[in-house]
Amino acid sequence: MNLLAVDTSGPVAGVAGLKDGEVAYEGAAVNRLTHSVNLMPMIEEALGRAGLDVSEIGLYAAVTGPGSFTGVRIGVSAVKGMAHGAGKPCVGVDALEALAAGACLTDALICPIQDARAGQVYGAAFLAGMPPVRMLPNMAEALPVYLDRALAVAGERRLCFLGDGVSTYRDAIVERLGERAVIAPAHMRYLRPASVGELAWLNRERSVDYLALMPVYLRAPQAERERARRLGGRA
């Protein structure tokens, strides 16, 4: 079975094509969240490079979050539309799990973090594996709270940090953890679409109808939070 995987949850947009679980094409671009413009051309290129026609895709996958609210919606909406048009099922993939899957050759506790703004990170923790072994659930917390929870499950392990949150919080992480902190190099920090495709393939028996594929948010979008604050202020 052929699979098309899409990620637009962060600053890097990516598309992968898989044939029976093997990656036939992977492409990604740092495009400053202009995913609505670039995604469909990237999908067309992925299909062409993988030697696939859209009619040959049997399963679609999208990263459902956490991540940029707008970015996640773009990828999920694109996959829902393609799956609906083709009458094919979908698989949602967790962004933090996919990040961890890209760091499978380490004995450290894998700590994917994304900059959630407002002084928070989206974070979780995993041990290496495919799929990764989850040690902490997804959370939206201030960095110190997240680090406390990661340390509580790390045991004697070092902690390996990756994801776009590293750029924002690297100094704070190193200051808190010292030599226990392993900062992934830049080329390993971002989510790879091939990891999305491989996780989707492993979960293909859990595929759903396009109507059931939905973004997964760890907190309300900023506009909703601001509206709630305004309404609360009037009470």
Question: Residues of each region from the PLM?
Answer:
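Residues at secondary-structure transition points
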Residues: 30-38, 69-73, 77, 94, ...
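Glycine-rich phosphate-binding/hydrolytic loop that grips phosphoryl groups
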Residues: 186-217
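Phosphate-handling active-site elements
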Residues: 50-56, 83-93, 108, 207-208
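Surface "functional belts" at beta-alpha junctions
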Residues: 22, 34, 89-190, 217, ...
